[in-house]
Regions:
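Charged, amphipathic alpha-helical linker segments immediately N-terminal to NTP-binding catalytic cores
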Residues: 1-19
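ATP-dependent carboxylate-amine ligase catalytic core
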Residues: 8, 19-21, 25-42, 66-152, ...
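Nucleotide phosphate-binding/pyrophosphate-handling subdomain across enzymes
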Residues: 41, 135-138, 147-158, 162-164, ...
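Beta-strand->loop->alpha-helix junctions that form or flank phosphate-binding loops
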Residues: 74, 192-195, 207-226, 246-250, ...
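C-terminal helical cap/extension that packs against the catalytic core
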Residues: 196-201, 208, 213-214, 225-227, ...
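Short, flexible loop segments at boundaries between secondary-structure elements
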Residues: 360-362, 428-435
Length: 435
């Protein structure tokens, strides 16, 4: 059989299973056994949560790599290239490596139908096992209990936050969401929770498993001032640790605090300077992602954020209010139909001078006209566009020097913006001008 390219593999995976999401571990476990998969690394950290999974995984990986450990990170979704999902020692997996992994999983699959995510998860585990990692950091795709990542018994289980999202799959209460996310815990293994008021099902699961629980505001926390922040936490034997004068971060420092608590439980060197440098160097594309653009002689700032639920919008609004803007703030906004529109836009209404709303390149997108009607009813200045690129270009034209353009609401929205920025940069070079 002719070898498939990565693009051909991904197209194949998209049509392999009748539904994009099919919760359950039975199919994946069956194929993993046939594939002969063991543990992806001697130590495994699994991360779930309504918000903050990606940045928490990135902080943990940075902290571990600063100590010379070889770390694999599995995350989703990707923004531009599938390779983003599988990182080994700070580098994205190669096309050739992913194709080899998909070939191995396909050979083991037989007649067992797997979803796109399940195939990708098993392929990542296959690559990690061969990379001889020290630590694997695994980000749950959806929920936790029935997510393919949960095939692996985690040494540390992290729950970043608990809010209502993906209600069709996880339920429409914090209690139902907590039950699903608590499914990543294992008997006697430490569990960490960044939500300082976890719902009862999570606490019941902790008691049932006799797992040590490290809870924010009780066992670890942070305090922030104008020049930096401090953290305290506990070691596995209950020793109190403290770090002061940590640098302020663009990414959520609450997630850095959770990552530090995970690090404290691994009994690794505690060089304060290395820790501070690792945190400050952490970047996550599409999360409070600041880009500078010269548009027709105007110096503009773009802020890209994949936040798409009320909790994420509240955090984003807080960060905008804490950081002064020389001019106005304009928005480019798109949202999927299963997301809570009023809850996402309300925290940001006071900060946005003008909205450009757009339909996203997904069958699940809310139409731009629906977004426009809602925002108009809330007294906002808004215009509708058919795609992200035209909305972004319209806001670039509207903006004056010193203005900031916030683009948020969906991974689809940020991915389209990143592709537009790539095209714009290429055209800029070809034209020999500054935009």
């Amino acid at each position: 059989m002719t070898q498939r390219s990565l693009a051909e593999w991904l197209a194949y995976l998209e049509r392999l299973h009748p539904s994009a999401i099919d919760m359950g571990l039975e199919r994946s476990r069956e194929v993993a056994v046939r594939l002969g998969l063991g543990r992806p690394a001697p130590r495994v950290i699994t991360v779930t949560g309504t918000n903050g999974k990606g940045s928490t995984c990135a902080f943990i990986a940075s902290l571990l790599r600063a100590q010379g450990l070889k770390v694999g990170v599995y995350s989703s979704p990707h923004l531009l290239r599938y390779n983003e999902r599988v990182q080994i020692d700070g580098e994205q997996a190669s096309d050739a490596g992913l194709c080899e992994a998909f070939t191995a999983v396909e050979a083991a699959r037989g007649d067992t139908s797997l979803t796109y995510f399940e195939m990708g998860t098993l392929a990542a585990f296959w690559l990690f096992e061969r990379a001889r990692l020290d630590v694997a950091v695994l980000e749950v795709g959806l929920g936790g209990r029935l997510d393919a990542v949960n095939l692996i018994d985690a040494d540390l289980a992290l729950i970043t936050s608990i809010g209502v999202d993906h209600a069709d799959w996880l339920g429409d209460t914090r209690e139902s969401v907590a039950f699903e996310k608590a499914g990543i815990m294992r008997p006697g293994k430490p569990a960490l929770c960044g939500d300082f008021d976890p719902p009862l099902p999570l606490l019941e699961r902790v008691a049932e498993l006799d797992s040590p629980l490290f809870l924010r505001c009780r066992d670890f926390d942070l305090s922030v001032n104008e020049s930096g922040w401090s953290w305290y936490g506990l070691t596995a034997v209950g020793e109190v640790l403290r770090l002061d004068d940590l640098p302020l971060l663009d990414l959520p420092m609450e997630n850095a605090a959770l990552a530090l608590q995970a690090y404290a439980l691994l009994d690794l060197p505690r060089d304060a300077e290395k820790i501070a440098d690792a945190l400050q160097a952490t970047r996550v594309t599409g999360r409070l992602d600041r880009r500078h653009l010269n548009w027709r002689g105007k110096s503009l700032t773009l802020l890209l954020d994949v936040g798409h639920n009320p909790h994420a919008a509240q955090f984003l609004a807080g960060r905008l209010q804490a950081r002064a803007c020389a001019g106005r703030r304009l928005a480019v906004f798109g949202l999927l139909a299963d997301k809570e529109l009023p809850g996402v836009v309300t925290p940001l209404l006071a900060d946005i001078a003008h909205w450009a709303v757009t339909t996203l390149p997904s069958e699940r997108s809310r139409p731009a006209a629906e977004l426009q009607a809602h925002l108009v009813s809330r007294g906002a200045h808004v215009e509708a566009h058919g795609d992200v690129a035209s909305a972004l270009e319209a806001q670039c034209e509207r903006a004056a020097a010193g203005d900031e353009i916030l683009l948020f609401g969906s991974f689809f929205c940020v991915a389209e913006a990143l592709m537009w920025l790539e095209r714009y940069a290429q055209e800029d070079v070809q034209d020999g001008n500054a935009g």
